[in-house]
Structures are given as C-alpha cells and as structure tokens.
Design a protein with these regions (language model features):
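Short acidic DE-rich linear segments
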Residues: 2, 91-93
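Structured surface patches comprising rigid loops and adjacent beta-strands/short helices at the edges
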Residues: 52, 76-91
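Anionic N-terminal interaction surfaces
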Residues: 1-53
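Serine/threonine-rich low-complexity intrinsically disordered regions
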Residues: 21, 62, 74-76, 84
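Acidic, low-complexity, intrinsically disordered interaction modules
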Residues: 38-74
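N-terminal functional modules and adjacent low-complexity/disordered segments of proteins
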Residues: 3-5, 33, 58, 76, ...
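Short, flexible beta-strand-to-coil junctions
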Residues: 23-27, 64-68, 88-91
Length: 93
C-alpha cells in the first residue's frame, strides 16, 4: 500500500473529509433498502484528488489522477433523492 496523501475537496475547496450517506434498493428485493456510505478518507481508490460536489440532481464524486491537467480516473454520480445526509469536516488550523 502506498502512503500518498489524497487531497479531499468539497465544491473545489480543500476539506478534511466528506461523508455521504445514501440508500439503495436491492434489485431482486425492491422492499429491502440498503444504507450505503461514501467516506472520502476511507475510499480505496488511489488518486491525487477527490472532489465532491452537489450539482443539479446528483452528488458528483470525481477522482483525479492529476487535477491540474484535468486527468480523471473516474466519476460517480449519486442521485440526490436517495441521499440521506452529507457531512463535511473542515480542515483544522
């Protein structure tokens, strides 16, 4: 495992962490709701920067290999209607 520190941003501003809690329905069991959680500090994706934004009807999570050159590893979009809560931890001075 590498010790590269990833930068976490919320709407482009550096923060300590972002946690998004949301729910999903099971495909074969629509009555079953599964609570999911995205935690930027615990996410295993190796990247330089992860930027979380609420844009229109989605929470957009973008993983950058190189943010200054806009080289994106991948994006995830979570519909806002399934989001239960978003926690943003600011950087400590």
């Amino acid at each position: 495992m590498t010790d590269i520190k990833k930068t976490i941003k919320f709407h482009g501003l550096e923060v300590a962490n972002v946690i998004v809690r949301y729910f999903q329905r099971e495909v074969n069991k629509p009555d079953v709701i599964k609570i999911q959680e995205f935690d930027a500090t615990k996410d295993p994706q190796i990247c330089e920067t992860v930027n979380i934004q609420v844009v229109s009807e989605f929470v957009t999570i973008t993983f950058y290999k190189n943010e200054s050159d806009n080289i994106i590893i991948r994006r995830e979009l979570i519909p806002t209607f399934i989001v239960e809560h978003i926690w943003v931890s600011d950087l400590q001075q």
